[in-house]
Regions:
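Extracellular beta-strand ligand-recognition surfaces/modules
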Residues: 2, 11, 68-70, 109-152, ...
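Disordered, acidic Ser/Thr/Pro-rich linker "stalks" and the adjacent N-terminal cap
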Residues: 19, 26-35, 41, 155-207, ...
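Extracellular ligand-binding interfaces
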Residues: 44-123, 143-148, 211-239
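Trp- and acidic/polar-enriched beta-sheet ligand-binding modules for extracellular glycan
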Residues: 152, 192-195, 205, 216-282
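Terminal accessory carbohydrate-recognition/targeting modules of carbohydrate-active enzymes
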Residues: 268-271, 275-559, 563, 911-1016
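Aromatic-rich carbohydrate-recognition surfaces in CAZymes
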Residues: 407, 432, 446, 453, ...
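Active-site acid/base region of carbohydrate-active enzymes
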Residues: 469-470, 474-480, 552-572, 596, ...
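Active-site core of glycosidic bond-cleaving carbohydrate-active enzymes
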Residues: 595-616, 623-627, 675-682, 726, ...
């Protein structure tokens, strides 16, 4: 390392250092003399898994290029070690993460370059950290050991010299040195043909891009850039045979060199360069960040919004019978299924080019609910409607995007629709997973037969034919400039090793007042050209297929109140779109895995809407991954099964099997699944047995499942999570029922008794944990006593255990949540939340807190992102445009939780009194006009149908149809009443067996009139 060196810490004073060790992990900091300085020892014990942090307050203004250096040694095997820089909030972190950090007995150098310290998390996403307030060293993993450090230094590696410049020839008035100056100075060659301009830096310097400003009257016909290697040889890093625009920005990520050579061919004219500039390492530490830097320098709209480090929301489209998933974002960028590339629209009207940043943007769905999204550009005198659909299935699938350009002016006008294929994706870089996100390199583009072949794999065909097609190596502004005057095919093929190949198709039309034109762009796999040949019918056919697939919603509300039901249908459709064959997965790009908890939640949600087959297919596919001892993987994806200790899986699997059979009896499915369910039960019992030893008798862990990481907050340090236990309670009850269905009454009684025993231990544990931690709410785990209302909600919804838990603790839990939600509404002192909170709706209504439940429901409905697409990300940020991780979008598990919450507002089963509760979450505002209609809503007792409406200020009418099998505890009718119930008639006969809010029905059909308030 060369540069200005500063000693930051000789480790002779431990006072600035702080040891942080969450959970069961331990960390001791100590130091010892070592020559002229000291050694800092981090003695750590990570127990079964966790992390420790040594933090030092250290306010530093960092130079443009730098490196931290230390020496290290130690013992303890291989761990993950992180070197982190933190700002004053301690919430924004940049880090180097070494996942293979090995320790040995000898001192070895530890060099941490600025370019290796990257943004990790927080709200201040920047590539270069200019100032830090603390330094952290974290050790992650398991086991124990010692990490020893000495001699912490900061080296300033910035380049402040002036390069030596020479040219192959130069006019006397315009010498080579002029390229380092400012306009109007410039270098001009004295000769024609290829000329060279060489810059010698005098020492190695870091840069990541070269900016070349050309003279507008002397643009070259070709140019190339060479950089000098450490051994003095020149390597070509860029070559172009196309005439550039006034400025060329050549991205050269992570370049360190002692010299640069520009080769310029001015054609018949002499070569000329106005200025050459070098971008620092953080301008383009990689290809994506370089493009993002260029986007920030360009006018808004020239590049996709996400490249300008602003959030861009997207949604999915897919065929009702297919498996491909395409994306469209709110700006109209369409990403093909598989994420291979995307298509961007631009509109030229006269001399003006319109981009997404120059128009009003509107989002919509077909029928206001189908997964057939549209984006409308509203420009001056025109609109552009962008509507992608997936057609067909398997090898015969295709993406068809219809661009409808409409003229709204009073006189004819000529427009040009320009479709660009550049290496950009809808999926932002902050969503990157397994190489997907931000960009998709385009190495090869070929123009053929009115379309393009992309990377030798995908074909984009257009109807009608384009008026011009342009292909080039530059993915920046020069493509848009080339499209403006292009005629015919400008280039038939382009290859680019850097992956920056791009192409554009131009469609010019003169439109009269009120006229429209449709342009279709169809993307198929290589060799597949006619998935659905009639472009005009493709979109209507896709809509009809989705209407047929979703059927009629089992819930109907007044026209002005339809949003909850429309969102229900969209949520169901998104589950179907995001799936891959039998694999139900929560997202289209980032979460393309079948997490069992997500998948069962999605499958049971569809089953509640009458679509049981996806749940059965899921379980038949997932079941064979089970091991002989009953162990289940927590997740399965393209790489196979994942075997993390996530013990919620067992209750979830059993619940999925039972729900499928309760909602659609199927003896063959029962026969297939009962042996697996028995093995799941055996595994569940063996897990619980680990906490039945005498050593746990007087602890809060007795009788529970072992430590687990099924909750994301417990990944670093597994704990006894009550989430797992409530799922286990549900699973035990369900497998007892399954045993009875399988004809094993003895086993059914044994398991039912086991469920009662487990419930008793669970309640005792909760009481002990609350006392230990001194809390009045239901905790999320034994060890932490943590507040987690979203997880605890399943105690009332999934586990149906509300009657057994202390009411005061339940109210305290959800009162605290509601206070947090209210604070979010009234302040800016929060950053993000997760719409998993929709689970709390079902918990609140089961507590009889209808108004609170509806307040949460309506608040979350109002925060769909965007509202017109009726979807939620996993993470919703206060700053709508913050370039922050969303999880995935649409997040189908959240959509499934919404389906469960909304359907339970109309009907839910109650275990302890064997009843079916109706209308406990119905909003009184829904009773106006035609009121509420429930048609064949799936329940454990058969399809439920009823109607509910307000007759006048004091009377509510309800009609429950026959056809359902009445449960032993009857139907508990709990409609929204304007005042306490005063009188009630059933089929015209007065009844007196009611309370202030409900009546229990034991015979159908029943026509009930609820009379409320004081005597008239």
């Amino acid at each position: 390392v060369t540069g200005k060196d500063t000693l930051l810490d000789d480790f002779c004073d431990l006072a600035p250092w702080q040891a942080i060790a969450p959970g069961a992990a331990r960390l001791k900091l100590r130091h010892a003399r070592d020559g002229d300085g000291c050694v800092l020892h981090l003695d750590y014990d990570l127990a079964g898994g966790g992390f420790v942090i040594a933090r030092r307050a250290l306010a530093l203004t960092l130079p443009e290029d730098y490196a931290f250096t230390l020496e290290r040694r130690g013992h303890g095997g291989q761990h993950i070690v992180e070197f982190k820089l933190v700002d004053d909030s301690l919430a924004n972190v940049w880090r180097l993460r070494d996942e293979h950090f090995a320790l040995g007995a000898e001192w070895t150098p530890w060099h941490i370059a600025a370019r290796d310290i990257i943004y990790a998390w927080g709200a201040r996403r920047t590539r270069r950290l200019a100032h830090c307030d603390a330094l952290e060293i974290a050790v992650v993993g398991s086991g124990r050991g010692t990490l020893s450090l000495r001699n912490l230094r900061l080296c300033d590696l910035g380049y402040d010299a002036t390069p030596r410049v020479r040219a192959s020839s130069a006019e006397a008035a315009h010498p080579a040195i002029e390229v380092l100056g400012d306009d109007p100075r410039h270098w001009r060659s004295a000769a024609i043909g290829e000329q060279t301009l060489t810059l010698d830096f005098g020492r190695e310097r870091a840069f990541s891009a070269v900016h070349i400003d050309w003279l507008r009257d002397a643009l070259p016909v070709a140019h190339a850039i060479d950089v000098r290697d450490a051994d003095g040889t020149w390597q070509c890093r860029h070559h172009s045979e196309q005439r550039p625009g006034p400025r060329s920005t050549v991205l050269l990520p992570d370049t360190r060199s002692s010299g640069l050579r520009l080769r310029v061919d001015g054609g018949a004219a002499r070569a000329a360069v106005r200025h050459i500039g070098f971008a620092p390492w953080y301008y383009a530490p990689n290809l994506y960040d370089g493009l993002a830097s260029m986007a920030l320098e360009a006018a808004p709209g020239v590049y996709p919004k996400a490249l300008r480090e602003q959030q861009s929301y997207w949604t999915v489209t897919g065929a009702a019978a297919g498996s491909g998933v395409a994306l469209i974002n709110t700006e109209g960028l369409v990403e093909v299924d598989g994420g291979d590339f995307a298509v961007e629209p631009f509109v030229a009207a006269g001399a003006t080019l319109f981009t997404w940043a120059d128009v009003k943007l509107e989002a919509a769905l077909e029928d206001d609910c189908l997964p057939l999204p549209r984006v409308r550009w509203c420009g001056p005198g025109f609109t552009l409607d962008i509507a992608p659909v997936m057609l067909g299935s398997g090898d015969d699938s295709a993406l068809d995007v219809r661009y409808r350009l409409s003229h709204h002016g009073s006189t004819p006008e000529t427009f040009a629709l320009e479709l660009a294929v550049r290496p950009f994706l809808v999926t932002p870089i902050w969503q990157q997973w397994q190489g997907h996100g931000g960009i998709a390199p385009l190495h090869h583009l070929a123009v053929d037969g009115g379309g393009l072949t992309v990377n030798h794999a995908r074909r984009l065909a257009v109807t009608p034919a384009a008026d011009a097609v342009v292909a080039e190596r530059d993915a920046g502004e020069s493509l848009l400039e080339a499209l403006r005057g292009a005629q015919g095919v400008v280039a038939r093929e382009v290859e680019d090793d850097a992956g920056l190949a791009s192409a554009g198709l131009v469609f010019r039309r003169t439109l009269g007042a009120g006229q429209s034109v449709d342009i279709h762009a169809r993307v198929t796999a290589g060799g597949v050209r006619n998935a659905c040949t009639d472009a005009g019918l493709a979109h209507a056919r896709a809509a009809d297929e989705w209407r047929s697939r979703l059927g009629v919603a089992p819930l109907r509300l007044p026209a002005a109140q339809r949003a909850p039901v429309l969102t229900l249908l969209t949520a169901a459709a998104h589950i179907l779109v995001n799936r891959r064959d039998a694999r139900l997965q929560p997202g289209p790009r980032r979460y393309t895995r079948a997490y069992l908890r997500d998948a069962v939640g999605m499958g049971t949600a569809l089953a509640r809407l009458g679509m049981v087959e996806p749940l059965k297919r899921l379980l038949d596919w997932y079941g064979p991954f089970q091991r002989d001892d009953g162990e289940l993987p927590d997740c399965v994806d393209d790489d196979g099964a994942e075997w993390l200790p996530e013990y919620d899986a067992y209750g979830q699997y059993l619940h999925g099997v039972a729900e499928a059979l309760r909602l659609a009896p199927d003896p063959a499915f029962l026969a297939r699944q009962w042996p697996r369910a028995q093995r799941v039960l055996a595994r569940l019992e063996s897990l619980r047995a680990r906490r039945l030893d005498e050593q746990y008798r007087d602890t809060a862990c007795f009788g529970l499942l072992p430590e687990s990481m099924s909750h994301e907050g417990y990944m670093a340090q597994p704990v006894h999570a009550y989430w797992d236990d409530f799922w286990a309670l549900r699973g035990l009850r369900d497998v007892a029922w399954l045993a009875a269905q399988a004809g094993d009454e003895h086993e059914a009684r044994r398991i039912a008794a086991l469920a009662v025993e487990f419930r008793t231990d669970l309640h005792a544990s909760l009481a002990r944990s609350m006392a230990t931690h001194g809390i009045d709410f239901i905790p999320g785990s034994v060890e932490l006593g943590d507040f987690d209302a979203t997880a605890i909600a399943i105690a009332l919804t999934v586990a149906d255990d509300g009657d057994g838990l202390p009411r005061a603790a339940l109210d305290a839990t959800f009162d605290r949540y509601l206070a947090i939600r209210a604070e979010r509404s009234d302040s800016t002192r929060w950053s993000n939340y997760s719409a998993y909170e929709i689970r709390i709706v079902g918990a609140l209504l089961r507590l009889g807190r209808r108004d609170d439940a509806l307040a949460v429901l309506h608040a979350l409905l109002a925060d769909c992102r965007p509202a017109a697409w009726r979807q939620w990300p996993e993470q919703s940020w206060r700053d709508y445009d913050a370039p922050a991780f969303l999880g995935d979008l649409p997040h189908s598990w959240i959509g499934a939780e919404y389906i469960h919450a909304l359907t339970s507002a109309f009907a839910y089963e109650h275990h302890d009194d064997a009843s079916l509760v109706l209308a406990a979450g119905v909003d009184g505002a829904w009773l106006h006009d035609e009121g509420v209609t429930v048609t064949a809503l799936a329940t454990h007792h058969g399809p439920l149908s009823y109607r509910l409406r307000r007759l006048d200020a004091q009377r509510v009418e309800m009609h429950v149809d026959a056809g359902i099998t009445l449960p032993a505890g009857g139907l508990v009718l709990r409609p929204p009443l304007p005042a306490p119930l005063r009188a009630l008639t059933v089929n015209g006969i007065a009844r007196h067996d009611f309370d202030q809010a409900s009546w229990r029905c034991h015979a159908l059909p029943a026509h009930i009139v609820f009379v409320c308030g004081d005597q008239p």
